[in-house]
Amino acid sequence: MAGRSGDSDEELLKAVRLIKFLYQSNPPPNPEGTRQARRNRRRRWRERQRQIHSISERILSTYLGRSAEPVPLQLPPLERLTLDCNEDCGTSGTQGVGSPQILVESPTILESGAKE
């Protein structure tokens, strides 16, 4: 892991092994039995998965020293956001999706109070 010290890598690997063990200790439920029994087993399994997920987040935040959730990105106001399609549109297999469109303003739609 680039830019990290070896000791930090060992701590992170230890945390990942622990999380992997937690998930492996909760295998998917057995598909046998009555519908109600299967439903109850799935419900209990999902609850254990949620608990393992929250424990895993706490382990990672402890070992990494930060939250597992990304910090929210501050965006400018919506009025200032624009889509600029002058820079090589459709390079990732989406030809035609990002083609520029011309906005024709209709006074009947934009001016709700005006009647013709």
Curated annotation (Swiss-Prot):
Biological processes, Gene Ontology terms: mRNA transport; protein localization to nucleoplasm; viral process
Bias-annotated ranges (Basic residues): 36-47
Keyword RNA-binding part of the UniProt annotation: yes
Motif range (Nuclear export signal and binding to XPO1): 73-84
Motif residue range(s): Nuclear localization signal and RNA-binding (RRE): 34-50
Sequence segments annotated as region (Homomultimerization): 18-26
Keywords carried by this UniProt record: AIDS, Host cytoplasm, Host nucleus, Host-virus interaction, Methylation, mRNA transport, Phosphoprotein, RNA-binding, Transport
Location of region: Disordered: 23-49
Recorded GO MF terms: DNA-binding transcription factor activity; RNA binding
Listed GO CC annotations: host cell cytoplasm; host cell nucleolus
Domain of life: Viruses
Pfam hit, one: REV
UniProt modification remark: Asymmetrically arginine dimethylated at one site by host PRMT6. Methylation impairs the RNA-binding activity and export of viral RNA from the nucleus to the cytoplasm. Phosphorylated by protein kinase CK2. Presence of, and maybe binding to the N-terminus of the regulatory beta subunit of CK2 is necessary for CK2-mediated Rev's phosphorylation.
Keyword Zinc annotated: no
Family: Belongs to the HIV-1 REV protein family.
Protein purpose: Escorts unspliced or incompletely spliced viral pre-mRNAs (late transcripts) out of the nucleus of infected cells. These pre-mRNAs carry a recognition sequence called Rev responsive element (RRE) located in the env gene, that is not present in fully spliced viral mRNAs (early transcripts). This function is essential since most viral proteins are translated from unspliced or partially spliced pre-mRNAs which cannot exit the nucleus by the pathway used by fully processed cellular mRNAs. Rev itself is translated from a fully spliced mRNA that readily exits the nucleus.
Subunit structure: Homomultimer; when bound to the RRE. Multimeric assembly is essential for activity and may involve XPO1. Binds to human KPNB1, XPO1, TNPO1, RANBP5 and IPO7. Interacts with the viral Integrase. Interacts with human KHDRBS1. Interacts with human NAP1; this interaction decreases Rev multimerization and stimulates its activity. Interacts with human DEAD-box helicases DDX3 and DDX24; these interactions may serve for viral RNA export to the cytoplasm and packaging, respectively.
Other known facts: HIV-1 lineages are divided in three main groups, M (for Major), O (for Outlier), and N (for New, or Non-M, Non-O). The vast majority of strains found worldwide belong to the group M. Group O seems to be endemic to and largely confined to Cameroon and neighboring countries in West Central Africa, where these viruses represent a small minority of HIV-1 strains. The group N is represented by a limited number of isolates from Cameroonian persons. The group M is further subdivided in 9 clades or subtypes (A to D, F to H, J and K).
Record comment regarding domains: The RNA-binding motif binds to the RRE, a 240 bp stem-and-loop structure present in incompletely spliced viral pre-mRNAs. This region also contains the NLS which mediates nuclear localization via KPNB1 binding and, when the N-terminal sequence is present, nucleolar targeting. These overlapping functions prevent Rev bound to RRE from undesirable return to the nucleus. When Rev binds the RRE, the NLS becomes masked while the NES remains accessible. The leucine-rich NES mediates binding to human XPO1.
Protein name: Protein Rev
Gene assigned in the entry: rev
